[in-house]
Amino acid sequence: MYPCILHKKCYNITKADAIPENRLIFKGRQTDKAIAKEHYSMRALNLTLLTDLYELTMMQGYFKNPTDQVVVFDAFYRKNPCDGGYAIAAGLEQIIEYIRDLHFTPDDIDYLKSLKIFDADFLEYLRGFHFTGDIYAIPEGTVIFPREPLVKVIAPVMEAQLIETALLNILNHQSLIATKASRVVYAAKGDGIMEFGLRRAQGPDAGIYGARAAMIGGCIGTSNVLTGQMFDVPVKGTHAHS
């Protein structure tokens, strides 16, 4: 199931095969459009190896010493950005896509084999790997504070170990951008704020998902045409200044 527990401000996004079409929440308004057109989705890019090497070597250690232990990990932050009083949660939708498509391709296995640090039986285990745990998360756009759980992972230890890096990468970046956007929108006192950050973003992925996060933070539009197409958000522009 995929219960939306709004009064608890928590989503259960587990059981990857049971997750329905993703939805966006902008300024409290939920849209019926899918998170992205299928051929533009990040699902087209397998992100399973978006992890630190030590996560995989630790997984092999657990594999060599079998355990059925289920662990609980909470993702939280210690200090508000820019010494502000709050932050804004963002990144959940990409986390959902990442979990849904979590698997090792033959190319992934071949690459890991080439590193010559993983045993054949462990690599064979990875061929059939999929996430079976539970994930609970605060909805995007929610005001959040230090040291409160934003995402809770309940899963077998190897599965929880693997997803740590990507989960934090997605959550931290997009929540930071959404928070900054929210502070700018608040300072504007009702004037509309547009997001024009693409040319200064740290690469295409940061530009695309940063623009989406800025919309969650309250911006009324973005200059990023690809973000507009992917997520059906307003695109806006002025003219050259040179």
Where are these regions (language model features)?
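Ordered alpha/beta subdomains of enzyme catalytic regions
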Residues: 26, 32-242
